Every structure is written in C-alpha cells, then in structure tokens.
Amino acid sequence: TKYYGNGVYCNSKKCWVDWGQAAGGIGQTVVXGWLGGAIPGK
C-alpha cells in the first residue's frame, strides 16, 4: 500500500481515501472530488 497524501492510499488493485485524514487536506478538494466518484459508499 502506498500513501499519496490527503488520506489517499493505493495498492495494486484500487485506491481509497481515509476521510479522517482527507479532512485535514481540505484545500485538495479537487483530488478528493475525482477520487470520490470511484469509492463505493462515500
């Protein structure tokens, strides 16, 4: 698993967001926006 910052993690199969950490990077809403569409249940 690799951590990309702003709560974003990726492994060989998928990427996901830790929203607790993502909330600390509120200035990076563009990143969270395009990742958010690919994350079920968020």
Curated annotation (Swiss-Prot):
Keywords: Antibiotic, Antimicrobial, Bacteriocin, Disulfide bond, Secreted. Disulfide bonds join C10-C15. It is found in: Secreted. It comes from the Bacteria. One of its GO terms (cellular component) is extracellular region. Belongs to the bacteriocin class IIA/YGNGV family. This is Bacteriocin bavaricin-MN. It comes from Latilactobacillus sakei.
